[in-house]
């Protein structure tokens, strides 16, 4: 019988750093173009010597200053308290009653939440997925490291390269070009390059008006796409519900949903057929687990957005887990990136979430 006492950790201090990493394939989307991407690295130090780690992807470097300040402020409020993510999450959310529970406030909570879960798993000597009651193993993934709104003549070669990166069986293409004819041409180029057996997701990055989406999605509805992602502005749940009800291709939203209650509002509105929460907006590990319970009860599939390392652990304890979104943006600053093989990400059998910083790279990318 194991008589080891339960792991008890106490939050001591938090160290937050900002880096900016060049992208292997620049983002070209309706919401903007990016050649570099900022990251916020959070290290939660405990009095027991265990350090939990997480990173955020705030999109714009100009946003990092305010987010870092909030992380540090919230950490100071929790200093000296038990590393108990559920308790700290509730405490932080209650503190926002008068300020609101969305935007950068929830993003700061997510940074601390993920790092605390990492610390607990490390202290327990277990991979995060095992601490959560699951098992280490592969998680099927699609490759979204390209196929942005690039010139159509480049689409075929890029699709072939993306499949070859890890024998991927699924890719994501960005749509919403100047005309539906151009969207159809881009889809045809992908099919010509990789064949009909490769699953193809599509993402509009909120680039269409409701009426524009209604026209265009009906014209694309027979293309055999896995889903239409965020065709219209993310918080128009009523508009999304109308589109989802009219189309045979599943409608996917979720990366811009803030927290479990906002997630429940989307589900109650029948805003989509499937959901893909983003860990920094949904509220970290705790926010994901609560949202996944809602999705499971409703029978709605859950895919991930960004954060493939933490997300892999969570997918293996999510009842309606569907697809993990693979992006390699974190690889340049991680000491031991996760293995990608046969269209799946493989969770390493090591304590915690499995991430650690390559300090030389962090120093090189610091801003």
Q: What does each model-identified segment do?
A:
Residues 2, 6-10, 14-21, 33, ...:
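Flexible C-terminal active-site loop/helix
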């Amino acid at each position: 019988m194991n008589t080891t006492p339960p792991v008890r950790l106490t939050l001591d201090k938090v160290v937050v750093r900002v880096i900016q990493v060049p992208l292997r394939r620049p983002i070209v989307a309706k919401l903007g173009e990016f050649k570099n991407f900022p990251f916020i690295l959070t290290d939660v130090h405990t009095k027991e010597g265990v350090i939990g780690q997480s990173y955020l992807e705030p999109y714009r470097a100009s946003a990092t200053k305010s987010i870092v300040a909030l992380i540090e402020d919230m950490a100071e409020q929790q200093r000296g308290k038990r590393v108990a993510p559920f308790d700290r999450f509730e405490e932080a959310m209650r503190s926002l009653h008068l300020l609101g529970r969305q935007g950068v406030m929830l993003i700061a909570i997510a940074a601390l939440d993920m790092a605390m879960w990492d610390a607990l798993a490390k202290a327990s000597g277990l991979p995060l997925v095992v601490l959560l009651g699951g098992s280490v193993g592969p998680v099927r993934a699609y490759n979204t490291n390209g196929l942005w709104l690039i010139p159509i003549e480049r689409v075929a070669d890029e699709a072939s390269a993306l499949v070859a990166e890890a024998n991927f069986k699924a890719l994501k293409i960005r749509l919403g070009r100047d005309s539906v004819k151009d969207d159809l041409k881009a889809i045809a180029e992908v099919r010509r390059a990789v064949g009909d057996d490769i699953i193809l997701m599509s993402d509009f990055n909120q680039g269409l008006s409701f009426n524009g989406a209604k026209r265009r999605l009906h014209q694309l509805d027979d293309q055999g796409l896995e889903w239409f992602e965020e065709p219209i502005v993310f918080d128009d749940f009523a508009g999304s519900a109308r589109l989802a009800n009219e189309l045979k291709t599943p409608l996917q939203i979720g990366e811009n949903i803030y927290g479990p209650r906002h997630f429940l509002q989307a589900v109650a509105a029948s805003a989509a057929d499937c959901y893909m929460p983003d860990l920094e907006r949904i509220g970290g590990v705790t926010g994901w687990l609560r949202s996944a319970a809602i999705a499971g009860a409703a029978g709605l599939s859950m895919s991930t957005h960004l954060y493939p390392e933490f997300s892999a652990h969570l997918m293996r304890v999510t009842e309606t887990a569907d697809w993990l979104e693979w992006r390699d943006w974190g690889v340049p600053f991680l000491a031991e990136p996760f293995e990608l093989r046969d269209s799946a990400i493989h969770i390493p059998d090591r304590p915690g979430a499995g991430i650690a910083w390559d300090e030389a790279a962090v120093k090189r990318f610091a801003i």
